[in-house]
């Protein structure tokens, strides 16, 4: 009798949504990717490559104090950049996109060829090495294109502009808002150039 009462109480207290859940085996992080045209690239990846976007390829520069031209232009008023710096940055961005877009297309084509080879089951060691070399060559060139523009920006930016960029991008704490203990707030703000 106690077991019946316990089961009835459990059934009443269990939400219907819990009872409706049913899984068909373990989910993997790749579930759903089988429907992609190119399994190794999402739709967003392809859009980013086709527009000449960074695709995270320049993080080594970005996170080590070498700003990228696209983000510099987005923040040009807050940094601030002068007209000459804006013109130089725009030229870098234009050059980068001019090179990155066709190279991104090359990477997409290489990943498509790899995808097709596996889909057809026509892969052997030699063809796999060739397909991978083509994809990695495109990716290496694309990464070079993006990273090389980052190290060019620091040639004409002032150190305080780079620091401001890092703060605005969330890579550094804002010294104007985080006054160290023991410092006179007014003097510290003046010393740090806070407005």
PLM ranges: what are they?
Residues 1-7:
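Bacterial N-terminal signal peptides that target proteins for export
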Residues 13-20:
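N-terminal signal peptide c-region/cleavage motif recognized by signal peptidases
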Residues 21-195:
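Charge-rich (acidic/polar
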């Amino acid at each position: 009798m106690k077991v019946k009462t316990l089961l009835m109480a459990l059934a009443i207290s269990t939400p219907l949504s819990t009872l409706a859940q049913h899984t068909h085996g373990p989910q993997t992080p790749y579930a759903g990717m089988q429907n992609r045209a190119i399994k190794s690239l999402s739709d967003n990846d392809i859009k980013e490559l086709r527009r000449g976007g960074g695709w995270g390829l320049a993080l080594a520069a970005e996170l080590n104090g070498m700003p990228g031209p696209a983000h510099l232009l987005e923040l040009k008023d807050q940094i601030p950049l002068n007209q000459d710096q804006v013109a130089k940055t725009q030229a870098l961005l234009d050059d980068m996109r001019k090179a990155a877009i066709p190279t991104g297309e090359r990477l997409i084509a290489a990943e498509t060829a790899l995808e097709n080879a596996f889909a057809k089951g026509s892969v052997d060691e030699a063809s796999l090495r060739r397909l991978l070399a083509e994809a990695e060559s495109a990716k290496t060139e694309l990464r070079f294109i993006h990273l090389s523009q980052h190290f060019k920006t620091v040639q004409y930016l002032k150190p305080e502009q780079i620091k401001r960029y890092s703060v605005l991008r969330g890579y550094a704490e804002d010294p104007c808002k985080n006054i160290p203990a023991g410092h006179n707030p007014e003097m510290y703000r003046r010393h740090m150039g806070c407005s």
